[in-house]
């Protein structure tokens, strides 16, 4: 590998001097070659130990130089921007070469982890494309795409295989873990050696956590890790059989993660932490998974979300799935110890309104179908080696400095929200469940300009003394406390869901309107763009995840009025992660149920009743054809209390019982939830 690396670096040095490629392409190749030479300089600083001796100011300069083409200040005239690349390099070639540069830019992270094979592979990709331009003044786009195709196909058994191993094997996914456990976290220079861009959010988060007492850090970490443990207990799964917890989190929260790792060790769990993917081979479309930075240029990420379109065909799908199966099979003993993810989410970032650029790579309709099929098969394959009925998860969220001047106060309020008395909520929510269990269906309506008008069918109970429809959800897998939820009966569930403003997976939606018939989406729109076609495409890509329709997988009533009151006090309702937002009103999830891949595991509420509403008429198809049962997505859409008219449960005999009216809880025993609202 060292010889290949040296040859590649020598070639980069030659490219920046040569004139064998015609303009405007020559300048592009020389620019990318210079970037790779910067990676070589970074490599020398890392390997020699020089980077550890650099001042924070020097580290910031090094970082800004490496990330210059991604930063908003420079992005408009960057080859990483497909719009600029097309302007300078022309049509298809511009989009293609922008995607190639983006693929190579992952090298910053690879050098920090000293995964030099990845850097070599990227440099050799550039050389092969460069050679094509030396042979022909302007090569045909198809011949260039073929080079990229075989790059992705050939090295799938490197990138995709390593991705799986980094997830399940703590000896592999250990770079971030070692940084957390071995570095002096009070010296913020460590951040610059983690391989992601360090902005205000990352630095100020770490600095603020350093100012907190160990007792406060322990409280946050204990809530997080204990939620994970209780998730196994409440679902009757044996945590003692497991050995690996996969931690996802945003850079800056290392002090909390360090304590959480110590807590997990007491449960017999070793941590694995992989970083968010920087390669088209392993990158998802809609969210960052793993260890990620907060302050990066989101438009850059959005512009390249469909770069997989350069290679997506049936043969590539089969190749990737083959690599996945081979990797799991070769590591099945290690995979058996995988317990599931523990996730720290964040909220408070500035609103990102994506610009849909025609110059960016787009998936064709056929490719969208292939992607949906691949994700479905990938999910089933993963479940084969990491069975859903044996693993669990937990997820918690905290704010980041970008939320505003009252960041410290909001952070303290969030700690309170995340540590509310679950026993109080458990009792109140049981009162609500007792009323809901008597219903045949529930009516949910909006107030004022909110057009929501939904009828939600409920599962019938064969034995009400031993069975229940709704889960009494307190603070285990979903922190904070505060919801009761069910999997609706699809048949007969119909109407309109409307929200004036909501953020889903970091993207805003204005006047989101979704219509349902027989529990499945039939129509959808929003007012984000002037063009109705763009609005529909935006929802199709980011909520339906390229499925022609999705069912309602969950109906829930959020009860965390404290979180709602905090949102009103600080005007941050639009900043909440869905994890908290879903607790601040009724919500509906489109996609899979909350019990996907574990429907046959019996689960019980604290009162001992079995929750029987774990399936619907689509998920039950898993017994005949799993490909028809799952969608690999679950998106919660919340109606805030101030847009809510009423929630009424209707019994078979027509008797109506109001749960909420005009944003206030009405059932005797639930009035305490109104106190924060008052």
Labelled PLM ranges:
Residues 1-491, 660-678:
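Active-site bordering "gate/hinge" segments
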Residues 509-526:
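Active-site and channel-lining beta-strand-loop segments
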Residues 475-513:
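Conserved AWS/pre-SET-to-SET junction and N-terminal core of the SET lysine methyltransferase domain
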Residues 584, 590, 599-604, 615-623:
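Glycine-anchored, exposed beta-strand/edge motif detector
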Residues 607-678:
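Extended hydrophobic packing segments that form well-structured cores
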Residues 523-595, 599:
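Dual-mode signal for accessory low-complexity, basic/Gly-rich regions
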Residues 437, 505-508, 548, 581:
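Short solvent-exposed loop/turn micro-motifs enriched in small/polar/acidic residues
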């Amino acid at each position: 590998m060292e010889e290949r690396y040296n040859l590649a670096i020598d070639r980069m040095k030659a490219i920046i001097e040569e004139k064998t490629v015609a303009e405007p392409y020559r300048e592009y190749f020389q620019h990318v070659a210079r970037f790779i030479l910067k990676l070589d300089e970074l490599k020398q600083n890392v390997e020699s130990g020089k980077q550890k001796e650099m001042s924070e100011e020097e580290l910031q300069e090094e970082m800004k130089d490496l990330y210059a083409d991604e930063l908003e200040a420079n992005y408009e005239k960057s080859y990483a921007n497909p719009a600029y690349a097309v302007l300078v390099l022309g049509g298809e070639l511009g989009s293609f070469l922008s995607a190639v540069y983006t693929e190579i830019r992952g090298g910053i992270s690879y050098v920090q982890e000293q995964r030099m094979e990845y850097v070599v592979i990227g440099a050799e990709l550039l050389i092969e494309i460069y050679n094509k331009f030396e042979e022909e003044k302007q090569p045909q786009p198809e011949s260039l795409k073929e080079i990229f195709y075989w790059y992705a196909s050939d090295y799938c058994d490197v990138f995709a295989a390593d991705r799986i191993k980094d997830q399940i094997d703590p000896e592999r996914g250990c770079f971030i873990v070692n940084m957390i456990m071995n570095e002096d976290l009070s010296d913020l220079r460590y951040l610059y050696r983690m391989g992601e861009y360090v902005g205000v959010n990352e630095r100020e988060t770490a600095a603020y956590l350093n100012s907190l007492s160990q007792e406060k850090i322990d409280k946050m970490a204990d809530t997080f890790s204990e939620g994970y443990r209780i998730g196994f207990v409440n679902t009757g799964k044996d945590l003692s059989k497991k050995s690996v917890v996969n931690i996802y989190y945003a850079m800056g929260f290392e002090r909390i993660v360090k304590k959480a790792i110590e807590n997990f060790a007491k449960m017999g769990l070793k941590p694995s932490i992989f970083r968010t993917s920087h390669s088209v081979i392993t990158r998802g479309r809609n969210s960052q998974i793993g260890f990620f930075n907060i302050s990066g240029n989101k438009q850059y990420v959005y512009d390249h979300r469909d770069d997989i379109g350069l290679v997506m065909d049936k043969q590539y799908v089969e190749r990737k799935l083959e690599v996945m199966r081979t990797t799991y099979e070769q590591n099945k003993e290690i995979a058996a110890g995988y317990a599931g993810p523990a996730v720290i989410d964040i909220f408070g970032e500035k609103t990102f309104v994506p610009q849909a650029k025609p110059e960016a790579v787009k998936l064709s309709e056929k490719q969208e179908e292939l992607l949906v099929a691949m994700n479905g098969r990938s999910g089933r394959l993963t479940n084969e080696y990491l069975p859903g009925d044996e693993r669990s998860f937990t997820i918690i969220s905290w704010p980041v400095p970008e939320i505003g001047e009252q960041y410290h106060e909001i952070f303290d309020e969030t700690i309170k929200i995340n540590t509310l008395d679950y026993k109080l909520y458990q009792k109140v929510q049981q009162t609500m469940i007792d009323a809901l269990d008597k219903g045949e269906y529930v009516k949910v309506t909006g107030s004022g300009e909110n057009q929501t008008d939904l009828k939600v069918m409920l599962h019938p109970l064969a034995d009400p003394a031993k069975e229940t429809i709704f889960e009494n959800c307190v603070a285990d897998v979903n922190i904070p406390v505060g919801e009761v939820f069910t999997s609706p009966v699809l048949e007969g569930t119909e109407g309109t869901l409307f929200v004036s403003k909501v953020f889903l997976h970091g993207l805003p939606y204005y006047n989101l309107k979704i219509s349902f018939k027989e529990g499945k989406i039939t129509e959808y729109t929003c007012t984000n763009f002037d063009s109705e076609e763009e609005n529909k495409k935006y929802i199709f890509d980011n909520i339906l995840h390229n499925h022609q329709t999705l069912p309602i997988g969950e109906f829930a009533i959020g009860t965390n009025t404290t979180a709602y009151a905090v949102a009103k006090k600080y005007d941050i309702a639009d900043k909440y992660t869905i994890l908290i937002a879903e607790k601040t009103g009724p919500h509906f999830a489109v996609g899979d149920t909350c019990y996907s891949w574990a429907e046959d595991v019996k689960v019980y509420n604290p009162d001992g009743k079995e929750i029987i509403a774990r399936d619907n008429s689509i998920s039950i198809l898993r017994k005949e054809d799993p490909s028809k049962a799952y969608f690999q997505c679950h998106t919660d859409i919340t109606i805030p209390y101030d847009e809510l008219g009423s929630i009424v449960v209707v019994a078979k005999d027509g008797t109506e019982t109001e749960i909420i009216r005009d944003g206030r809880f009405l059932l005797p025993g639930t009035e305490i939830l109104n106190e924060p609202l008052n």
